Amino acid sequence: MAKHISKQDSENNTTRREFIKQVGFSAAAAGMVTPLLNKAYPVTEQKTTECRVKYRVLGKTGLRVSEIGIGGHSWAYKQVPDGQGGYRRPTVNEATRMIAAGMDKGVNFLDSCTALQESSVPGEALKRLKARDQVIVSIRVSHKMKGIKADKQEIYKWTEDRLKLWQTDYVDLCLLCNTENDTLQSGYWDMSYSIEALDKLKQQGKIRFTGFGCHFTPELFLEAFEKFGDYFDTCSIPYNIRHRAAEKVLPAAKKKGLGVITIKPFVRGALLKNRDLTGTDAGLPRDLISFVLENKLVDICTCGVHTIEQVRENLSASWTKLSPGGRQRLEKLAAFDIGEKEYAWLEEGWRYA
């Protein structure tokens, strides 16, 4: 049976803090970072004790969620410098330190990738931290993908696979996702068998709440809200300084009481490409997240992290207001062509006309 997310376990809190103290930040001398617990990111005059992630309510779920969540791309892609001019994925030890540091600042939402890219790393990290019941775990299950048979058994299979990867007997949120051919003709909108499958998974105690969303257009989101908004609890929508069509979509989501989870604040790094993030462009990731959080119709901004420095930078957006100068910088950034063919779906569908 799913356990209530608000349960606080002092023993687990101690375990997490001790892990950070004994394992995580002892690595600073080996090239890690300044301890997150001891030195807040120097962008505000607030006291360190006040530098914690704020919370919002995730729509009709009623869940109290951190307004910044850790995205699934954190573990699935090679983004960590390997010291030899290339990149690699974070190790389990690195992931454990990052998740522990985030939780100590109040983060309680961990998202997943689309099913074909899922990783076992965050599940192993939570096991080491004994922290499963202190976070909200969201998985993404392929409702319909090219080459994947669309039926209830596939949804059961994807879900069981995700439960094993996360080393848990339940997840808090299960989102139906599609990664290509998101059209009315593709069959994505035949949700009858999907809803039946989700209902069964709920009855079995394997999922608590449901949602949907991925790469389809704002127009199709609006249609989905109208058709399925009464059933689902949440939606996942791309939103960033360049791709702002979500601002036309979010009111409809809230009208249905849906919790809103935004993705792609950096367009998977495209907005940060070739930027001097330790010099003239310092604070840019923070400001990109701050922009998203200014929209009070957003409940969670999920973002990828690949190093503990990025954890510290991203979370600081929760207690750092976007300055006029920062806003001007973002507006200039939004005018540049990102030049990423992989994200043509964002360019074509999510920019204001």
Where would I find each of the regions flagged by the language model?
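N-terminal binding-site loop/beta-alpha segment at the start of enzyme catalytic domains
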Residues: A2-V135, A197
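Glycine/proline-rich, positively charged
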Residues: I148-S236, I241-R244, K248, K254, ...
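Conserved, mostly hydrophobic/aromatic
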Residues: L58, I70, L110, V137, ...
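Active-site beta-loop-alpha junctions enriched in small/polar residues
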Residues: H73-W75, C113-A115, R140-K144, L176-T179, ...
